């Protein structure tokens, strides 16, 4: 291979390794068999959630994973691989890809990484069942509001009972 090609591939490895280091979550899938229309819809959904989705050669992915400290992730880079990176929402790529795979059986989740730790296919699927960030925040808010609401209702009940007694 010419030195220019080797340099270009080394640069690509560096770019992918940086994306892997910066990502909150990484999901690796086998998208072989998706139609162009399905792939376009999937990419649009992922882009809407600020998830970057790329088809990258396995040799480059293996080298980038090594460089990013995710050596154990190399075992999923077998066969055609596409990678979804999310820097913000840990759940988004897993949720979108899992939901999409229910309608498009050709899409298969292979594994990934969560917050810099390698995750198996089962762990990625478990992550996909969690509510998204907004859902988790609303659950937290309702848990925090419950005691205040209970105190307010108790005070209101006491006030009403005193009014009835008077």
UniProtKB/Swiss-Prot annotation:
Signal peptide: none annotated. CDD domains: Ribosomal_L10. The keyword Chaperone does not apply. InterPro entries: Ribosomal_uL10, Ribosomal_uL10-like_sf, Ribosomal_uL10_bac, Ribosomal_uL10_bac_type, Ribosomal_uL10_CS_bac. GO terms for molecular function: large ribosomal subunit rRNA binding; structural constituent of ribosome. GO terms for cellular component: large ribosomal subunit. One of its GO terms (biological process) is translation. Keywords: Ribonucleoprotein, Ribosomal protein, RNA-binding, rRNA-binding. The keyword rRNA-binding applies. Part of the ribosomal stalk of the 50S ribosomal subunit. The N-terminus interacts with L11 and the large rRNA to form the base of the stalk. The C-terminus forms an elongated spine to which L12 dimers bind in a sequential fashion forming a multimeric L10(L12)X complex. Forms part of the ribosomal stalk, playing a central role in the interaction of the ribosome with GTP-bound translation factors. Belongs to the universal ribosomal protein uL10 family. This is Large ribosomal subunit protein uL10. It comes from Streptococcus pneumoniae serotype 4 (strain ATCC BAA-334 / TIGR4). The gene is rplJ.
């Amino acid at each position: 291979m010419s030195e220019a090609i080797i340099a270009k591939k080394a640069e690509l490895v560096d770019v992918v390794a940086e994306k892997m280091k910066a990502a909150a979550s990484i999901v690796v899938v086998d998208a072989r068999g998706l139609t162009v229309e399905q792939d376009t819809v999937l990419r649009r959904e992922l882009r809407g959630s600020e998830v970057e989705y790329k088809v990258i050669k396995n040799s480059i992915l293996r080298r980038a994973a090594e460089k990013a400290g995710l050596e154990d992730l190399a075992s999923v880079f077998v066969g055609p691989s596409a990678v979804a990176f999310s820097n913000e929402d840990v759940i988004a790529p897993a949720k979108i890809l899992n939901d999409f795979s229910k309608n498009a059986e050709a899409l298969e989740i292979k594994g990934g990484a969560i917050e810099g730790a390698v995750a198996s296919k089962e762990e990625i699927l478990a992550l996909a069942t969690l509510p998204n960030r907004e859902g988790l925040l609303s659950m937290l808010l309702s848990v925090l509001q419950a005691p205040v609401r209970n105190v307010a209702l108790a005070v209101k009940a006491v006030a009403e009972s005193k009014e009835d007694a008077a």
